């Protein structure tokens, strides 16, 4: 029997506010445990939550970016459950009336096709604390610094049909929240994490199978591996006569498998009811339009513009718009180079990103600025240096030896364009290789490349390759 996989993702994006969603406590990562949890976060008697307007603005910004409906009235509810890192005994979330409804994202598949993925809703809620299992002599510690941090939970439609599609959707969403500057997207710190609802059904059947929820997947690789394992597990279980149970499962990255955590709760298990301490959130059209005006150029729009304006391939444009920071870096290189977009793209994607990855650096920590790289591209274009020599200059720039023009001057790397000097080098090369000259004249045209290489070697890469080719042909064909 052929099986079809059905996947829906719930993405939790920590919003980049400086204070928590219902209190003035800081949200900075890495503080000593329990140093950033105030009385509101701890659910102490007599304290009242106050909604952070910045979180509302960020949620609205996200909704507008995906073409969703922004609810003029949304309501916070209490989601009741017990867990050690949930000090109040309930989580403030949104249930029946979320702030964002509908919307869509388009993902690129491996075969180059694009697919629309619907978004059901996105709602605001507070994060829970964190259980710590190491260094406690068999006990569990609880850090409540994270409790009350604003989250935007983004729920997709069950439109994803493979682990690869799920990873592509997650990457697209990750890029978008970073473009919008509403989430730093740091997956190692838990700022962007995912729960995956996975089920299988016979191909062609409309009814959904029983789903399992895979919790807290915090890397693109883990999402793909966990879903693939879970799909295989469910199919094997059904084909052996078993039944898939609706449950929550945890992915064990070391073993590459999922394991059962608990039976999956339904909404009524949480006994949602409107939070009596918080008024409904009412947004007027003026506020929504003000937020709309702050939207940056979005990734898909920027990618299309790079193809149209700079003449890049769709693939190159996709690489260069993967993050807002890289796209801005590239455009600065183009501007500084004098508008040489394609060569700038080649250098950014090739030598620059290669050096960055090799050094394990973030873009912001690069020793080569976009202005420096742009000036290097300009020196290639105006034939001050050859492409080969440019690699030597780039390496020196990366090692902190200065600006491209300083390095070119200090190392004597300017391209030789003097015809007399190049002819003298050609004469020396031809005199040193009489056998090859004879073979070339006998019809071995491919030896021209050999002679060009020898002249370039003699000039230490400084001779103008175009002139070398032209003058060699003149001498050899005469």
Curated annotation (Swiss-Prot):
GO biological processes: glutaminyl-tRNAGln biosynthesis via transamidation; translation
This protein's name: Aspartyl/glutamyl-tRNA(Asn/Gln) amidotransferase subunit B
EC nos: 6.3.5.-
Catalytic activity field: L-glutamyl-tRNA(Gln) + L-glutamine + ATP + H2O = L-glutaminyl-tRNA(Gln) + L-glutamate + ADP + phosphate + H(+); L-aspartyl-tRNA(Asn) + L-glutamine + ATP + H2O = L-asparaginyl-tRNA(Asn) + L-glutamate + ADP + phosphate + 2 H(+)
EC class: ligase
Cystine crosslinks: none
Pfam families xref list: GatB_N (PF02934), GatB_Yqey (PF02637)
Task performed by this protein: Allows the formation of correctly charged Asn-tRNA(Asn) or Gln-tRNA(Gln) through the transamidation of misacylated Asp-tRNA(Asn) or Glu-tRNA(Gln) in organisms which lack either or both of asparaginyl-tRNA or glutaminyl-tRNA synthetases. The reaction takes place in the presence of glutamine and ATP through an activated phospho-Asp-tRNA(Asn) or phospho-Glu-tRNA(Gln).
Oligomeric and partner information: Heterotrimer of A, B and C subunits.
InterPro entries for this protein: Asn/Gln-tRNA_amidoTrfase_suB/E, Asn/Gln-tRNA_Trfase_suB/E_cat, Asn/Gln_amidotransferase, Asn/Gln_tRNA_amidoTrase-B-like, GatB, GatB_C_1, GatB_Yqey_C_2, Gln-tRNA_amidoTrfase_suB_CS
Family: Belongs to the GatB/GatE family. GatB subfamily.
Keywords: ATP-binding, Ligase, Nucleotide-binding, Protein biosynthesis
SUPFAM superfamilies per record: GatB/YqeY motif, Glutamine synthetase/guanido kinase
Any GO MF annotation of the entry: glutaminyl-tRNA synthase (glutamine-hydrolyzing) activity
């Amino acid at each position: 029997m052929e099986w079809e996989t059905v996947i829906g993702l719930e993405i939790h994006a920590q919003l980049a506010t400086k204070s928590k969603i219902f209190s003035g406590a800081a949200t900075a990562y890495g503080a000593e445990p329990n140093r950033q949890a105030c009385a509101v976060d701890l659910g102490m008697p007599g304290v009242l939550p106050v909604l952070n307007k910045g979180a509302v603005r960020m949620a609205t910004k996200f909704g507008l970016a995906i073409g969703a409906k922004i609810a003029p009235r949304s309501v916070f509810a209490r989601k009741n459950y017990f867990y050690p890192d949930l000090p109040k005994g309930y989580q403030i979330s949104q249930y029946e009336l979320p702030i964002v409804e509908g919307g869509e994202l388009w993902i690129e598949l491996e075969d180059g096709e694009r697919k629309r993925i619907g978004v059901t809703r996105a709602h605001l809620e507070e994060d829970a604390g964190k259980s710590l299992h190491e260094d406690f002599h068999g006990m569990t510690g609880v850090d409540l610094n994270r409790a009350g941090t604003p989250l935007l939970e983004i729920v997709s439609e069950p439109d994803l049909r493979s682990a690869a599609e799920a990873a592509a959707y997650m990457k697209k969403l990750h890029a978008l929240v970073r473009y919008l500057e509403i989430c730093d997207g740091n997956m190692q710190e838990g700022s962007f994490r995912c729960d995956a609802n996975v089920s299988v059904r016979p191909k062609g059947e409309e009814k959904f199978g029983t789903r399992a929820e895979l919790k807290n997947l915090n890397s693109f690789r883990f999402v793909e591996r966990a879903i693939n394992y879970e799909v295989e597990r469910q199919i094997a279980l059904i084909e052996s006569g078993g039944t898939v149970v609706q449950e929550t499962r945890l992915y064990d990255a070391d073993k590459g498998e999922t394991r059962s955590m608990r039976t999956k709760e339904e909404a009524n298990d949480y006994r949602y009811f409107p939070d009596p301490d918080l008024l409904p959130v009412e947004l007027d059209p003026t506020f929504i339009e003000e937020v709309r005006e702050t939207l940056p150029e979005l990734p898909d729009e920027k990618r299309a513009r790079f193809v149209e304006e700079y003449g890049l391939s769709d693939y190159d444009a996709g690489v260069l718009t993967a993050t807002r920071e890289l796209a801005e870096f590239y455009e600065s290189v183009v501007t500084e180079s004098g508008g040489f977009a394609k060569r700038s793209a080649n250098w950014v994607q090739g030598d620059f990103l290669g050096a960055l990855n090799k050094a394990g650096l973030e873009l912001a920590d690069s020793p080569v600025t976009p202005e420096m790289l742009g000036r290097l591209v300009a020196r290639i274009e105006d034939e001050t240096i050859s492409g080969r020599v440019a690699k030597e200059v780039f390496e020196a720039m990366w090692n902190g030896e200065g600006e491209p023009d300083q390095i070119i001057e200090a190392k004597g790397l300017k391209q030789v364009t003097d015809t007399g000097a190049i002819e003298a080098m050609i004469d020396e090369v031809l005199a040193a290789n009489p056998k090859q000259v004879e073979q070339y004249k006998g019809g071995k045209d491919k030896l021209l490349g050999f002679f060009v290489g020898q002249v370039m070697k003699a000039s230490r890469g400084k001779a103008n390759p175009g002139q070398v080719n032209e003058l060699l042909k003149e001498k050899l064909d005469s």
